[in-house]
């Protein structure tokens, strides 16, 4: 398939730049893959849509305040986006500057902090830099980020981070710091909604996938089969695997809350021929899911509406069916559903209930 097969016109007015103050008040489009029926709801209706015994699987990653601002020694402003923390004093990062960044170059954070960052390695093929934090008056890089870092909201918001993002660009259940983007399907769940679901007999489990900045990057090759995914760190515990097996045994649905959960679960199942022998997984994955992929674990998917020509819409098209997802997206646009991280949600089920 061609990347252009996933191109559509997304009106700017449908891109939410700010979140709903009440998480579960967003709209919810429900698509039944077997009947191809589309229905319209609010996210707070989810308890009436799911069944007792269904299993919701969340990504428990948490966004780190990974964006830093500083200056070069020549006085030029720079922006540094931490991609991955390597140890207490080193990280891999993007550096955005009006000047070419050189090996060994020094940057200064803030105006009075006297914290220096040195470029100690350049990954040219990835446009990334390995940096070392010097004269740091903190225990480690993470404690520095927690003090002076900014929440790395998506570039399509076209604004700086604000106080509201520190709360609402995090899920209420996120516990493991490591992402520089939120698992946005989970942003719609508030504590009250989760408790309602639990009281109705709907089960909950977790995986961990730390999301990098490449989640915002478009696919730049003509044929999608030639696209190379970025590394993402994944953990799928044995207790989550056991919850999945019990759910399958009782004929309920395994529902992935977000594309990151899909990638984590399908990675864990990648090299197994039978669900009964799936084991826990911990490590990096480059799984790329696009139409033609055969899903091994996931029965249903909760996800936001994604950018054209992105790997995320390709994954959703693989799950819902390519022609189906074009029809669903057209319906969402016609009815003014909001798109992207702070937008509305959709629920795709592969079984008519």
UniProtKB/Swiss-Prot annotation:
Pathway(s) per entry: tRNA modification; tRNA-queuosine biosynthesis
Pfam families given in the database record: Queuosine_synth
Gene Ontology molecular function: S-adenosylmethionine:tRNA ribosyltransferase-isomerase activity
Leader peptide range in chain numbering: none
Gene Ontology cellular component list: cytoplasm
UniProt keyword annotations, A-Z: Cytoplasm, Queuosine biosynthesis, S-adenosyl-L-methionine, Transferase
Enzyme class: transferase
InterPro entries assigned: QueA, QueA_dom1, QueA_dom2, QueA_sf
Compartments (UniProt record): Cytoplasm
Its EC number(s): 2.4.99.17
Catalyzed reactions: 7-aminomethyl-7-carbaguanosine(34) in tRNA + S-adenosyl-L-methionine = epoxyqueuosine(34) in tRNA + adenine + L-methionine + 2 H(+)
Top-level taxon of the source organism: Bacteria
One GO term (biological process): queuosine biosynthetic process
Reported function: Transfers and isomerizes the ribose moiety from AdoMet to the 7-aminomethyl group of 7-deazaguanine (preQ1-tRNA) to give epoxyqueuosine (oQ-tRNA).
Subunit structure: Monomer.
PANTHER family: S-ADENOSYLMETHIONINE:TRNA RIBOSYLTRANSFERASE-ISOMERASE
Family: Belongs to the QueA family.
The protein, known as: S-adenosylmethionine:tRNA ribosyltransferase-isomerase
Organism: Blochmanniella floridana
């Amino acid at each position: 398939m061609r990347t252009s097969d996933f191109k559509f016109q997304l009106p700017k007015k449908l891109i939410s730049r700010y979140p709903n103050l009440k998480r579960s008040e967003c709209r919810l489009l429900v698509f039944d893959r077997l009947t191809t029926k589309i229905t319209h709801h609010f996210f707070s209706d989810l308890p009436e849509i799911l069944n007792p015994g269904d299993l919701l699987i969340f990504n428990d990653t948490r966004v780190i305040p990974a964006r830093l601002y500083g200056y070069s020694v020549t006085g030029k402003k720079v922006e540094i986006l931490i991609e991955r923390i390597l140890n207490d004093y080193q990280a891999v990062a993007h550096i955005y500057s009006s000047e070419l960044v050189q090996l060994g170059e020094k940057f200064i954070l803030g105006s009075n902090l006297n914290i220096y960052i040195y470029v100690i390695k350049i990954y040219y093929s990835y446009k990334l830099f390995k940096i070392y934090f010097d004269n740091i008056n903190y225990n480690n890089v993470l404690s520095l980020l927690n003090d002076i870092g900014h929440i790395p909201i998506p570039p399509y918001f076209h604004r700086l981070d604000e106080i509201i993002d520190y709360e609402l660009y995090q899920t209420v259940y996120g516990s493991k710091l490591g992402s520089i983007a939120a698992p946005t399907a989970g942003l719609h769940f508030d504590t009250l909604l989760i408790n309602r679901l639990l009281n109705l007999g709907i089960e909950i489990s977790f995986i961990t996938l730390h999301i990098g900045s490449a989640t915002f990057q478009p696919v730049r090759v003509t044929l999608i089969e030639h696209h190379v995914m970025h590394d993402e760190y994944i953990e799928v515990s044995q207790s989550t695997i056991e919850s999945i097996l019990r759910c399958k045994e009782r004929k309920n649905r395994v529902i992935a809350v977000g594309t990151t959960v899909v990638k984590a679960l399908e990675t864990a199942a990648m090299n197994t021929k039978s669900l009964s022998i799936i084991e826990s997984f911990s490590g990096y994955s480059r799984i790329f899911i696009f139409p033609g992929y055969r899903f091994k674990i996931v029965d249903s998917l909760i996800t936001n509406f994604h950018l054209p020509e992105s790997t995320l819409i390709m994954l959703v098209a693989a799950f819902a069916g390519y022609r189906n997802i074009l029809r669903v997206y057209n319906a969402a646009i016609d009815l003014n559903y909001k798109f992207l991280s702070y937008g509305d949600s959709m629920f795709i089920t592969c079984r008519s209930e």
